[in-house]
Amino acid sequence: MSLYRSPSAALLKSPSQAAFGAPFGSMSVADLGSLTRLEDKIRLLQEDLESERELRNRVERERADLSVQVIALTDRLEDAEGTTDSQIESNRKREGELSKLRKLLEESQLESEDAMNVLRKKHQDSCLDYQDQIEQLQKKNAKIDRERQRVQHEVIELTATIDQLQKDKHTAEKAAERFEAQANELANKVEDLNKHVNDLAQQRQRLQAENNDLLKEVHDQKVQLDNLQHVKYTLAQQLEEARRRLEDAERERSQLQSQLHQVQLELDSVRTALDEESIARSDAEHKLNLANTEITQWKSKFDAEVALHHEEVEDLRKKMLQKQAEYEEQIEIMLQKISQLEKAKSRLQSEVEVLIVDLEKAQNTIALLERAREQLERQVGELKVRIDEITVELEAAQRELRAVNAELQKMKHLYEKAVEQKEALARENKKLHDELHEAKEALADANRKLHELDLENARLAGEIRELQTALKEADAQRRDAENRAQRALAELQALRIEMERRLQEKEEEMEALRKNLQFEIDRLIAALADAEARMKSEISRLKKKYQAEIAELEMTVDNLNRANIEAQKTIKKQSEQLKILQASLEDTQRQLQQVLDQYALAQRKVAALSAELEECKTALDNAIRARKQAEVDLEEANGRISDLISINNNLTSIKNKLETELSTAQADLDEVTKELHAADERANRALADAARAVEQLHEEQEHSMKIDALRKSLEEQVKQLQVQIQEAEAAALLGGKRVIAKLETRIRDLETALDEETRRHKETQNALRKKDRRIKEVQQLVDEEHKNFVMAQDTADRLTEKLNIQKRQLAESESVTMQNLQRVRRYQHELEDAEGRADQAESSLHLIRAKHRSSVVTGKSSSKIFVTEDDY
């Protein structure tokens, strides 16, 4: 029983301890070597178990042979009883010879008692040897129990440390949940910003269409300007012809001078009326200037007010024409001869005054344009400085992004190594589970066989009791036969010879059986000594290994506590930084709202940015699709990782690595959030710069529109001058050289002003083109900042997903550790139950041996008694 108990107890302890100790190993090659050594030890224990099973089977076969021999002896005893019954009558005749046989019987009894004493001493010596061996095995079992209690104490301490780690993990999970909530809020804000960007893109498309229409109108105005230049050339030729005609008309004018003096008084009255009309015209022109200033502020009223003002000018012109016609009719009545000349003169004077007023307006507008150009140049310089700052920030962000990418590559490489180590540990763990299952099955078979042996021993004990009762009955019959022995001397003589022969055979069989038993006992003692030596070496090696593992676990627990304290400090710092970043984000949102309001005022002049925003939108869609694909890939990878971690998450070293990775991931998340906020601020600044550039462009375009309107008015005035020149040519014969010289100088001044205005218009157009190119460059920078923002957002999303994965891994590792603890407790209960069953089996075996010794003693005594009777 002790031979069976020790290896089974060792087998129960070693796999359970291996199953408990294996999760606390590290993922190095040394731990894999220790796992292989454990497998070798388990194989050796299994081989020892097989050898002990073979020995047990051999003992069972010998016990079966002995039971067969006992049955044969009982059969012979029954035959002997039958022969005694048949010879009772003959023994009655030989009662006289009984006295002689009694003496011989007493002598034979003394001899049998001496032989029984010798056999009893030998049996007691063998029993003492067995008891010594059993005591030694019990001492070894006590040592093993003490080792088991020590390991249980260590298990309790490890459970306490695991509970502390679970509490720390719970606090870390709460902090991670807060970070997730903050990340979700930031994601919602980013979505709102994306919606605003989409709305701005739609508005920019509309402005692009309006800008295209304006460009078409500018092209038409350029064509009209070319036509006007051609007309100016033709007018110059006509002016030369008019000069020649004026020389001819000068001679006629001297003749008409006297007549003109008479009409001069009437012309003075007409001039007073014309002065009043010019004052009214100047008032109207002043109103027109006020209307132009209001047009710049109120764009929606521009067209209506221009139309209204144009109608007022037309009405005034019509009134002037009517008055002029009335005056001409009066002059024709007064002086029919000079009516045409005076009409032309009055008309030319009124138009010259109008041109003077228009020229002053043009000079004022030119001065305004010059001031606006200087302001635009200053703003362009500021934009250049800001763009340089944006480029510097962009380069810094790109460097930070490259550093983050390098860190991500390192983390990916470490993650792949961890996955490979997890797979190897999963395979090793599966092998250990299979071997543990086989050992449990072998233990169940051994328990079943032990139960069968107990039943067999009980049956043999019953048979031995029956044999003892039969022997008692035979003794009573022997006493009856002693009274009748005198009548059976002849039969007893023959029976004595037969019994001596049988007794000799029995003695030979008992001697052979004793030798076989002694040989088996010696062999079992040697096997027990070998098993004991192996068990001691195995226990010492396991003790050293567990002590080393406990030291490693203490070191890992200390490192884990330090890492947890550092992680809590970093979490506090990051929470403060997140609060600061949230405040800055709110400020940036308010600034963005202001920028959007300003951008709404400049909706019509952002057409050049529509194509770039569309490209940004497509890039954003592509980034979103890539992000979704990455999330799908990440979910698949998470599935594979969860499958691997569900097997080996009971390893404390992996848990330590996961917690360190959690801290590094939180640090990376904080860095990425900082970069995200910095990129958001840079994008907001770039958008503000773009909005200011768009406003400047809008002002330049308004100035260009004013210049175009002025150019149109000048063209109309030139046309009117052409008509007036044609009329003057008709009336040149009646005019004077002074008026013609004034008109020529006025025309030259107007031409130079027109050339200067066209040159400035071209310069403003070139400046507008430069501004457009600069705005496009700024928009490209804004697009790059937006791309960086999208990339940073993707990295933030990936880090949040990784944080969730690590949280799940921590939860799974805790569940696996709890399962392992429950499994260790279950193994302990099973070990205690097995030890109790082994003790019960040992006690029952002692009882069976005692009963067997008593049955052997009674059997030998009965056989000696029959021998003495046969002698008589």
UniProtKB/Swiss-Prot annotation:
It is found in: Cytoplasm, Myofibril, Sarcomere, A band. InterPro entries: Myosin_tail (IPR002928), XRCC4-like_C (IPR014751). The keyword Disulfide bond applies. Disruption phenotype: Defective extension of body wall muscle connections or arms towards the ventral nerve cord. Double knockout with madd-3 results in severe muscle arm extension defects. RNAi-mediated knockdown causes an accumulation in the proximal gonad of endomitotic mature oocytes in 22 percent of animals. This is Paramyosin. Keywords: Coiled coil, Cytoplasm, Disulfide bond, Motor protein, Muscle protein, Myosin, Phosphoprotein, Thick filament. Homodimer. May interact with unc-89 (via SH3 domain). It comes from the Eukaryota. It comes from Caenorhabditis elegans. Structural component of the muscle thick filaments which is involved in assembly and organization of sarcomere myofilaments. Involved in ovulation. Plays a role in the formation of muscle connections, also called muscle arm extensions, between the body wall and the motor axons in the dorsal and ventral cord. GO terms for biological process: actomyosin structure organization; cortical actin cytoskeleton organization; embryonic morphogenesis; locomotion; mitotic cytokinesis; positive regulation of ovulation; positive regulation of sarcomere organization; regulation of actin cytoskeleton organization. For most of its length, paramyosin appears to form an alpha-helical coiled coil and shows the heptad repeat of hydrophobic amino acid residues and the 28-residue repeat of charged amino acids characteristic of myosin heavy chains. However, paramyosin differs from myosin in having non-helical extensions at both termini and an additional 'skip' residue that interrupts the 28-residue repeat. The distribution of charged residues is also different from myosin heavy chains. Its main location: cytoplasm. GO terms for molecular function: cytoskeletal protein binding; protein kinase binding; Rho-dependent protein serine/threonine kinase activity; SH3 domain binding. PANTHER family: CINGULIN-LIKE PROTEIN 1-RELATED (PTHR46349), MYOSIN TAIL DOMAIN-CONTAINING PROTEIN (PTHR46349:SF7). Phosphorylated on serine residues in the N-terminal non-helical region. GO terms for cellular component: A band; cytoplasm; cytoskeleton; myosin complex; myosin filament.
